[in-house]
């Protein structure tokens, strides 16, 4: 065998190995590929991805907090969901606690970077109020 045929055999072997590895990766991730395609199938012919979704890998207010009580979370309160932490409740303005009908709405509001909301802590002035007792119970 001359050197050129050895080189061609090596190149062909490497190409076949790369193809086999790619097929194996597709086989291993087939469920994830199907899920991604079904999620984004409506966008197949669109020029931009114009959907209302939050990529929580980029911004999460809990990323730099080490104390568990300081982390923001959504909890059920009076058949609505509210966003709470040790700092208090997320509020519309003043003492109006922001209520959400679904937990997804609460999560989207709490973890959206564009949302700069006020925080209302009922335990500062009235330590015995219903809101303060609830806040202490979930922390």
From Swiss-Prot:
InterPro entries: Poxvirus_A28. Keywords: Disulfide bond, Fusion of virus membrane with host membrane, Late protein, Membrane, Signal-anchor, Transmembrane, Transmembrane helix, Viral envelope protein, Viral penetration into host cytoplasm, Virion, Virus entry into host cell. It is a single-pass type II membrane protein. The chain crosses the membrane at residues 1-21. One of its GO terms (cellular component) is virion membrane. The keyword Thylakoid does not apply. Pfam families: Pox_A28. Contains two intramolecular disulfide bonds. They are created by the viral disulfide bond formation pathway, a poxvirus-specific pathway that operates on the cytoplasmic side of the MV membranes. It comes from the Viruses. Envelope protein required for virus entry into host cell and for cell-cell fusion (syncytium formation). Belongs to the poxviridae A28 protein family. This is Envelope protein A28 homolog. It comes from Yaba-like disease virus. The lineage of its organism: Viruses, Varidnaviria, Bamfordvirae, Nucleocytoviricota, Pokkesviricetes.
């Amino acid at each position: 065998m001359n050197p050129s045929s050895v080189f061609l055999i090596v190149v062909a072997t490497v190409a076949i190995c790369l193809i086999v590895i790619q097929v194996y990766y597709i086989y291993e991730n087939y469920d994830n590929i199907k899920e991604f395609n079904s999620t984004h199938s409506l966008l197949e012919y669109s020029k931009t991805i114009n959907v209302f979704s939050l990529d929580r890998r980029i911004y999460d207010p809990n990323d730099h907090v080490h104390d568990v009580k300081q982390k923001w979370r959504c909890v059920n309160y009076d058949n609505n969901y509210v966003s709470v932490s040790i700092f208090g409740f997320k509020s519309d303005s003043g003492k109006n606690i922001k209520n959400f009908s679904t937990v997804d709405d609460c999560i989207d509001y709490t973890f959206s970077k564009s949302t700069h909301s006020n925080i209302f802590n009922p335990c500062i002035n009235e330590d015995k109020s219903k809101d303060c007792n609830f806040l202490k119970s979930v922390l």
